[in-house]
Design a protein with these regions (language model features):
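Short, solvent-exposed secondary-structure boundary/capping segments
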Residues: 52-56, 92-106
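A short acidic, Gly/Pro-enriched loop at the edge of an enzyme's catalytic core
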Residues: 375-388
């Protein structure tokens, strides 16, 4: 036991106490309320006794300036559950949307009351779902479709549960592996058909903000809880690191394991892997280009290769583990805003660097993507690069910011260097419905013309786009003269 005089306080800036902030996804695990400010609706990011932070995943129609006092309204299923006035105290632009922090002016958050009103609003919405004005915005065809999806999924769950009960009466144990393998092929086939239908239906609501938000709320209430039985769906929806598509989700795709406590959970996870398969296939394309660059440019000096938004950098790890890595010298630079991702990449790649005896070096930059856009940003710290790639970042950006980033990366290329940009492809079986509506994972889907436009006016030797094996990711290649 410590004596009273041995008890310690905080140091530095932490001596200024602030009320505890709660992650909105944890405080409201089923469906966090939206925050209405002026004419725009925002995602609640975190909340404390005296303030909130929100995220705008699409460009806001309203301009918010630091110091401005505005009215804020929390809405659950279209019903108001909290109202107050707040001062804008911070704004931040990230690849995943704009963040705004507000300090309440003449009120505070009564958490007991807020949670109670949130539940009441959800119950009221459930009780009047078909007649409520907001939920009338959800297409009738989509309601029936979600029922069909649940019917398919729960038929597998019921079948597995029944067989598990039957085997409990016999001395033989339930064959979990056999049950998984018996269901997997047929279930994935049915899922892909439903996925295609879902895409067709939700494209009709994408042009209307109100209809899109209402349809997403319906999905998150009806379908998302079922899908969260799968590990990759749960992490994608909950976003425990505060943003979508974190490096652990990438790892789940690369590892392609049967995650889950039972066969049904493993199968739902498998459906999520089917959607995210393009993360792995785009990685294989990049790994091939790394090998080409090292072979062509890494003989007399190290080929310089930079990855923006590197995440776990599995393409580099697997390249270094292959015989191709002995074909030349290389110097890799990993850039990511998440130190944990860089730490894991370093831990996994460093043993291979030792084995290669100095042929390959690696640097890591923990800087924000916004810094990259600045003239005197992080790219000034590295020499001109023979290859730069960013395959999981620009689909979070508006077209204007994406164009600026492409130009900034192109400037950082050495003569003859190659820039590779990946973006989710606009195609019939795109990831639109499963990611945007089930997992609340907002991306910009683009076609050949939209991506090629980013290269216009750069003075490139050549530029073109390709898609990887699944056709769900489009890659823009720009070669500098």
């Amino acid at each position: 036991m410590l004596a009273y005089e041995e008890l310690k306080g905080s140091n530095g800036k932490e001596i200024w106490f602030r009320p505890t902030r709660f992650d909105a996804r944890k405080l409201f695990p089923n469906n966090p309320p939206r925050v209405r400010v002026k004419s725009s609706s925002y995602q609640l990011h975190n909340i404390s006794l005296t303030g909130i932070a929100v995220v705008a995943k699409q460009a806001s129609e309203d301009e918010l300036t630091v110091g401005e006092t505005v009215s804020i309204v929390f809405q659950q299923a279209g019903l108001s559950i909290f109202e107050g006035r707040a001062k804008v105290c911070r704004t931040e632009t990230t690849p995943f949307g704009s963040k705004y922090a507000f300090s309440l002016v003449d009120s505070y958050v009564d958490f007991d009351r807020l949670l109670s009103r949130n539940v009441q609003a959800q119950i009221a919405a459930n009780g009047s779902f078909l007649s409520s004005e907001r939920n009338a915005l959800v297409p009738r065809e989509y309601r029936a479709f979600c029922s069909d999806v649940l019917g398919v999924l729960r038929s597998y769950r019921a079948l597995l549960d029944e067989n598990l009960r039957v085997t409990a009466n016999f001395p033989h144990t339930f064959d979990h592996v056999g049950a998984y393998e018996a269901c997997e092929g047929r279930m994935v086939e049915q899922w892909r058909s439903l996925w295609l239908t879902g895409n067709d239906i939700v494209r009709e609501v994408m042009g209307s903000r109100d209809a899109r938000e209402a349809t997403k709320e319906f999905t998150e209430l009806v379908l998302t809880p079922e899908m969260r039985a799968g590990a990759i769906w749960d992490r994608s929806y909950m976003k425990p690191m505060g943003y979508p598509g974190d490096y652990q989700i990438m790892n789940q795709v690369y590892d392609w394991e049967r995650l889950g406590d039972n066969v049904y959970q493993q199968l739902i996870h498998r459906l999520g892997l089917e959607v995210a398969e393009c993360i792995g296939t785009r990685m294989h394309v990049v790994r091939g280009k790394i090998a080409d660059t090292v072979r062509e440019r890494g003989q007399d000096r190290p080929a310089r290769i930079l990855s923006l938004g590197s995440g776990p950098a599995r393409e580099i790890e697997t390249y270094l583990e292959s015989p191709q890595s002995r074909g030349g010298k290389a110097e890799f630079t990993l850039v990511d805003q998440e130190p944990q991702a860089l730490g894991q990449a370093y831990d996994r790649i460093y043993p291979a660097l030792i084995k290669l005896g100095g042929l390959v070096r690696m640097n890591s930059l923990n800087i924000s993507f916004t810094d990259i856009l600045r003239t005197h940003g992080g790219l000034n710290q590295v020499p001109p690069q023979d290859m730069i790639y960013s395959v999981g970042l620009l689909d979070y950006l508006t077209d204007r910011r994406a164009r600026l980033l492409v130009a900034r990366l192109y400037e950082a290329l050495a003569p003859g260097g190659l820039l590779i940009i990946g973006n989710m492809n606009e195609t019939a079986l795109s990831n639109l419905w499963p990611m945007e509506f089930i997992a609340d994972w907002t991306l910009e889907y683009r076609n050949d013309g939209e991506m090629r436009a980013w290269a216009e006016g750069l003075g490139a030797q050549e530029y073109w786009t390709e898609t990887e094996k699944t056709d769900r990711v489009r890659l823009l290649f720009i070669r500098k003269p």
